[in-house]
Curated annotation (Swiss-Prot):
The protein's role, per its UniProt record: Anchoring filament protein which is a component of the basement membrane zone.
Region (6 X SEK repeats): 184-281
SEK repeats: 184-186, 190-192, 202-204, 208-210, 269-271, 279-281
Protein name: Ladinin-1
Tissue distribution of the protein: Expressed in kidney, lung and keratinocytes followed by liver, spleen and brain. Not expressed in testis, skeletal and heart muscle and in fibroblasts.
InterPro entries per UniProt: Ladinin_1
Subcellular location: Secreted, Extracellular space, Extracellular matrix, Basement membrane
């Protein structure tokens, strides 16, 4: 249990480090944007006098500067003042951070790199070969500082979340656009990989975080030799910055205040459920990737192949996980806790972290319930699994409830379709058999003299109309087809009865008129 607790604490600290790393990346981009704005304002004054500086700026613009030059004209003095205030608070925090780092473990790379970055002038920022060098150095330094700053990272998260919320209200779109360009410039290899590969790498980021951290530590040691820098750069950029891009886009879309606590809640909820599986997987990742960090970059490239195979397994499971999000944590339905899967479904890396070992490590898992559950997961389609496998399982209640929830909508859909087909068939048959309906009327009508009298005696149809309808209404408890036919026949007979009564009334009115006409003529004759 102690080993699993250590693994879980390491995973949670790595998740916190990832959120802090993304926030630090946004800070760095804001600093760079502010530096570019100051460099453009400094370059505007000597443009009139020095033609050489103007040509050099026009000759070597980087992709980031080209994007920054578009939103720079609407930037006003108020925004510059806000940026300067944010930069001041960051400098104070950076000094505090350096003091704590000096107490814990003195890292000399961070102040040196920051001095180099702060000493960059407006002429040097426009040159291209310095820009990728700065970015390559930024990755390991940031990761090292985050690993050593584990215990007091929560206080920094709160302060940074407040400032970032203030800053992102003003310029959210620019940060998203520049984050994408920064990640695309950092990873030339990641441009070859398609978009679903990026998602899968981001979803496998939580279990494989330890290995990437150890590789970054080895990268800082090998950074000083320029020969080894190029293959290590490709191996790290394939693993680390690609999930950063998706995670940054997730966090800029969602409010940043909410993301770290939701991550922690999801991790804590899954800690009670899948502790053994994830501890085994984390130990496997740790062993393989620590040995990988000690070896040459060729083995780093070789070890990416099993990662891609794991990604292909995740592709086979991904549509099923999206169609049925209840199945992603297996034991969560056994404990009947619906709240954790809803929280974990917001973050796809965590849900697939639980799902992948259930298929990969069937032989390693000791618990029999998970074995039966994963064997049922391997079936062809989830709907057929749920109610075919449920009578065989006695210990778990989840497939019964799940089969009920799956069966009801399927059965209602089938009944609705059948009813629609019946109604259409009835309408067609009525439209076809409407001329010959007089035959069926005599056969279907209930027996009785009062009900058949209106067929022969039209004079009494108005009086006897109420009796047959009541008799028919009592006898209408039949099948749907017969009732529909009877209703049609009743409506037709009512129409015919109404026509007959109208004819009787017309005849009566004609006779009355004739009588009135004869009466005044006779009276006139009598008067004469």
């Amino acid at each position: 249990m102690s080993v699993s607790r250590k693994d879980w604490s390491a995973l949670s600290s790595l998740a916190r480090q990832r959120t802090l790393e993304d926030e630090e990346e946004q800070e760095r981009e804001r600093r760079r944007r502010h530096r570019n704005l100051s460099s453009t304002t400094d370059d505007e004054s000597p443009k009139l006098t020095q033609n050489g500086a103007q040509r050099s700026v026009e000759r070597l613009p980087s992709v980031e500067e080209a994007e920054v030059s578009k939103p720079s004209p609407p930037a006003s003095k108020d925004e510059d003042e806000d940026f300067q205030a944010i930069l001041r608070t960051r400098k104070e925090r950076r000094q505090r951070r350096q003091v704590v780092e000096a107490v814990q473990a003195p890292v000399q790379e961070r102040p040196e790199a920051e001095e180099e970055r702060d000493s960059l002038g407006p002429e040097q920022t426009s040159s291209q070969p310095l820009v990728p060098k700065k970015k390559v150095e930024a990755l390991p330094r940031r990761r090292l500082s985050r690993e050593q700053r584990g215990p007091w990272a929560q206080d920094e998260e709160r302060l940074k979340n407040r400032e970032l919320a203030e800053g992102e209200k003003r310029l959210p779109e620019e940060t998203v656009a520049q984050q994408k360009t920064l990640v695309s410039e950092k990873t030339p290899v990641s441009e070859k990989t398609p978009v679903p590969a990026k998602r899968l790498v981001s979803e496998k980021a939580c279990p494989s975080e330890k290995g990437t951290a150890t590789e970054k530590a080895s990268l800082t040691e090998k950074r000083h030799s320029p020969e080894k820098l190029v293959p290590e750069k490709t191996s790290v950029t394939e693993k680390s910055p690609v999930p950063e891009k998706t995670l940054v886009s997730l966090k800029t879309a969602a409010p940043e205040r909410r993301s770290p606590p939701v991550l922690e809640k999801a991790i804590v909820s899954e800690k009670m459920q899948e502790r053994k599986l994830v501890s085994e997987k984390a130990s496997i990742f740790e062993k393989s990737l620590v040995s990988e960090a000690k070896l040459t970059p060729k083995k780093a490239a070789v070890s990416e192949q099993p990662q891609t195979t794991g990604g292909s397994q995740a592709t086979t499971r991904e549509p099923r996980g999206r169609a049925l999000p209840d199945k992603s944590p297996p034991s969560s339905a056994e404990q009947s806790t619906p709240a954790p899967p809803t929280k974990a479904s917001r973050f796809p890396p965590i849900t697939l972290q639980v799902k992948i070992p259930s298929k990969d490590e069937d032989a390693d898992t000791p618990s029999p319930t998970l074995l039966t559950y994963s064997s049922s997961l391997k079936r062809s389609s989830p709907r057929t699994i749920s109610f075919r496998m449920s009578p065989r399982k006695d210990n778990s209640e989840t497939p019964l409830t799940r089969s009920a929830s799956v069966r009801l909508p399927a059965s209602t859909v089938k009944l609705g379709e059948k009813l629609e087909r019946y109604h259409t068939a009835i309408q067609r048959s009525e439209s076809v058999r409407s001329p010959g309906s007089s035959r069926t009327e005599v056969l279907v009508t209930p027996a009785g003299v009062a009900s058949k009298r209106h067929l022969f005696e039209k004079e009494l149809s108005g009086q006897n109309r109420t009796e047959p309808t009541s008799i028919r209404k009592e006898n209408l408890r039949l099948s749907g087809v017969v009732t529909s036919r009877l209703n049609l026949w009743i409506s037709k007979t009512q129409d015919s009865g109404d026509h007959g009564s109208q004819e009787v009334r017309k005849e009566a009115s004609v006779t009355k008129r004739a009588q009135w006409g004869s009466k005044p003529s006779t009276s006139l004759d009598a008067e004469v």
